[in-house]
Amino acid sequence: DAAGTKISEEKMISLDYGSNLSRFEIILKGTDTISAGLTLHENKGEIGINEKNGWLSYWEPHEDSELGLGIVVPENTMVGYEHYLTDRKDESNLFAHIQLNTESKVAYYAGFGWKKSGQFKSKKEWEAYLNKFSECLKNPLLLTIN
């Protein structure tokens, strides 16, 4: 119950081998948008927003390393974003507002990269990964077998 409106949700989460981002597939009844967010922990990092490619990111220090967090939303379904800041630890967020399709479904990708993994050395490299991931969603590999 959300302010008098009954909302129901079905969710399937999957992760392709070798990917840094999990796929979230959600069926919702009772609303036409959802918000998916990144926790900004201690607010010591840098946010990145690319509405054209449908992603939000946060690059932050983590212990003796750094982490990149990200959300990628398939083309034309991110209808906005919100940067919510507070002084309270782990309560600041960067939200992507996502439109459900006509079947009350939505899909988005979320995950992280760790500097110590050797995959990403900087915010720039992390955001290049998000751009490439977004481009792959826009241009999927198609196979024809005869």
Regions found by a protein language model. Give the residues of each.
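Beta-strand-rich recognition/accessory modules
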Residues: 75-146
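Short, surface-exposed linear segments at secondary-structure transitions and domain or protein termini
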Residues: 18-24, 45-48
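A short, structured loop/turn motif at beta-sheet edges
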Residues: 17, 27-33, 99-105
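Short, well-ordered beta-strand segments enriched in hydrophobic/aromatic residues
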Residues: 11, 22-29
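Extended, loop-rich substrate-binding clefts of extracytoplasmic carbohydrate-active enzymes
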Residues: 1-17
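Polysaccharide-binding surfaces and accessory modules of carbohydrate-active proteins
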Residues: 35-86
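Solvent-exposed residues in well-ordered beta-strands and their adjoining turns
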Residues: 27-29, 39-41, 111-115
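Generic recognition of long tandem-repeat/solenoid scaffolds
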Residues: 1, 54-58, 96
